[in-house]
């Protein structure tokens, strides 16, 4: 049985301050192939990640805590995340985008609400029950959630999305469900964190439109 998001987070945090370094891999990868381990773990490494966006075999890349966490204040400011934020997020922490955002919110003392199953009716219930005001989902899940929303929700002020494209047609759907929201689409990589971002006012259907650098 796969570990819950809560269990994944506890396991990741449990390695902090120990000699062990966790390696973040896709949920369907049970172990790291020895062929990827080509060098010693560098001093100060807090985790290992697999390079993303490559057509070839991914490479194992180690990151220090500072290379990752030092960017939290910048991304939180751009996305409007504060200690009062109540964000809904769904998905495994094997996706480093989820892990990054979880820890950036926790660093502020913000609240994270999640649900394990891919069930938009459950998501809608949890969002309403916990007075969520921000969403973080990949675009395909955002579309699913917006279609299942039984009524518009003015409480949602921020929508974060990444890893997939999001066009103007998608924004019409999202704005109908969350009329007072501002949507941020970002592009990033496990080995680099966030790279570029744009808001819903800047989105179009041109796949080359990736926004401005962080």
Kindly give the residue locations of the regions a language model identified.
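Conserved coil-to-alpha-helix start sites within the AMP-binding
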Residues: 1-16, 90-108
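ATP-dependent adenylate-forming carboxylate-activation enzymes
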Residues: 3-7, 22-33, 110-130, 139-141
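Conserved pre-ATP/AMP-binding loop-to-beta segment of ANL
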Residues: 4, 35-50, 80-87
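Flexible, low-complexity linker/hinge segments
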Residues: 21, 25-46, 70-72
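Conserved AMP-binding A3 loop
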Residues: 45-73
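Conserved AMP-binding/adenylation subdomain of ANL enzymes
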Residues: 70-86, 94-134
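Gly/Ser/Thr-rich phosphate-binding loop
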Residues: 134, 148-206
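Short Gly/Pro-enriched turn/cap motifs at secondary-structure boundaries
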Residues: 207-213
